[in-house]
Amino acid sequence: MTTSQRTAAILVAAGRGLRAGAGGPKQYRTIGGRTVIHRALAAFAEHPEVAVVQPVVNPDDIDVFNAAVAGLRHEAPARGGATRQASVLAGLEALVPHKPEIVLIHDAARPFVTPAVISRAIIAANKTGAAIPVAPVTDTIKEVGASGDITATPERAKLRIAQTPQTFRFDTILEAHRRAAREGLTEFTDDAAIAEWAGLTVATFEGDVANMKLTTPEDFVREEARLAASLGDIRTGTGYDVHAFGEGDHVWLCGLRVPHTKGFLAHSDGDVGLHALVDAILGALADGDIGSHFPPSDMKWKGASSDQFLKYAIERVAARGGRVANLEVTMICERPKIGPLRDQMRARIAEISGVDISRIAVKATTSERLGFTGREEGIAATASATIRLPWGA
């Protein structure tokens, strides 16, 4: 049996996380263009040595969870409990049929865990049976009494910041959690504490100072700034598309079904606005064009809705650790009139792409009755996309 077949991961995502503000659980907030939970889950789902990824979520969050992690590999979510400890036990019980030898337990609120930390966790578990990642303490720590006066100054050299994923042999941590539940002990703050209580020796391995837990609004502000600073490779791409009119009573423009006296002659739905945007994004990535990814010779795309093309292009940006800074599309036509639909089109592009509407522009012009657009034989669109990538992505 290979290491990957023996290793499972639990992603604990059932907390409400209200201290982070924004009116909802912090794991579903967006940071750097992706949800916190998508970043955390992807780290394990994309790791070659992790065979099973078991999320644990609040029952009220199933729909938002599924939307946030669409496309990522994971098991059906286990139902979270009233405490983190109960949620971890639910995740462990859900893994029993998989019979893993090693389990990594990770908090969804730590979205910046790296493949290197995950690999070190697996090595540590196989070597010691129980281990946690730690980071050095750089500040001086004080113990304070009820009066607010300092009572002691711990020796900093002996202190470490505990992180996740905390990693264990599956059978031993499962039994420790079951035993704690039977005895009504519910106040353990992490899995290492349960392991210590159960008599296990818990080793440590090198964590990562960037693997921090997002807790407060200030944490989100700081990490957004850090991510933005890391995306220094700024790229711009342009796109162009045109479709002739044919028979019909509507056209698709920027994701909207627009009534018209004609329709488009096209392999897909003919949405020139979205097609131009897709080409602009792919151009910024130096990743071909819409025809190379969705060839018109492939009947799979016959009549296809163009929103899936735009989603795909956005996913290509995210896959390289980037984010979209701006999208702009200009429609060139006499009719239908774009002005009254401008804000609806911006909103629809934002909905499809996940890009904030403040970063989306829709414009329109005519060709002054010149050329095929002036003769109302079709519609053209030009687009530009500005994206930010990490250097070397």
From Swiss-Prot:
Query: Which GO terms are recorded in the biological process aspect for this UniProt protein?
Result: isopentenyl diphosphate biosynthetic process, methylerythritol 4-phosphate pathway; terpenoid biosynthetic process
Q: Which residues bind 4-CDP-2-C-methyl-D-erythritol 2-phosphate?
A: 241-243, 267-268, 289-291, 365-368, 372, 375
Query: Record keywords: Signal included?
Result: no
2-C-methyl-D-erythritol 2,4-cyclodiphosphate synthase, as annotated region: 235-393
Q: Which reaction does it catalyse?
A: 2-C-methyl-D-erythritol 4-phosphate + CTP + H(+) = 4-CDP-2-C-methyl-D-erythritol + diphosphate; 4-CDP-2-C-methyl-D-erythritol 2-phosphate = 2-C-methyl-D-erythritol 2,4-cyclic diphosphate + CMP
Q: Which cofactor does it need?
A: a divalent metal cation
Keyword terms of this UniProt record: Isoprene biosynthesis, Lyase, Metal-binding, Multifunctional enzyme, Nucleotidyltransferase, Transferase
| UniProt-annotated stretches for the region 2-C-methyl-D-erythritol 4-phosphate cytidylyltransferase | 1-234
Q: Pfam families this protein is in?
A: IspD, YgbB
What EC numbers are recorded for this enzyme? 2.7.7.60, 4.6.1.12
What intrachain disulfides are recorded? Answer: none
GO molecular function, one example?
2-C-methyl-D-erythritol 4-phosphate cytidylyltransferase activity
By its UniProt entry, which CDD domains does this protein fall under? Answer: CDP-ME_synthetase, MECDP_synthase
Residue ranges annotated as transmembrane are none
Residues with site note (Transition state stabilizer) = 19, 26, 267, 366
Question: Which pathway does it take part in?
Answer: Isoprenoid biosynthesis; isopentenyl diphosphate biosynthesis via DXP pathway; isopentenyl diphosphate from 1-deoxy-D-xylulose 5-phosphate: step 2/6; Isoprenoid biosynthesis; isopentenyl diphosphate biosynthesis via DXP pathway; isopentenyl diphosphate from 1-deoxy-D-xylulose 5-phosphate: step 4/6
Q: Which family does it belong to?
A: In the N-terminal section; belongs to the IspD/TarI cytidylyltransferase family. IspD subfamily. In the C-terminal section; belongs to the IspF family.
Spell out the HAMAP family in the cross-references: IspD, IspDF, IspF
Biological function: Bifunctional enzyme that catalyzes the formation of 4-diphosphocytidyl-2-C-methyl-D-erythritol from CTP and 2-C-methyl-D-erythritol 4-phosphate (MEP) (IspD), and catalyzes the conversion of 4-diphosphocytidyl-2-C-methyl-D-erythritol 2-phosphate (CDP-ME2P) to 2-C-methyl-D-erythritol 2,4-cyclodiphosphate (ME-CPP) with a corresponding release of cytidine 5-monophosphate (CMP) (IspF).
Name of this protein: Bifunctional enzyme IspD/IspF
- Please name the source species: Bradyrhizobium sp. (strain ORS 278)
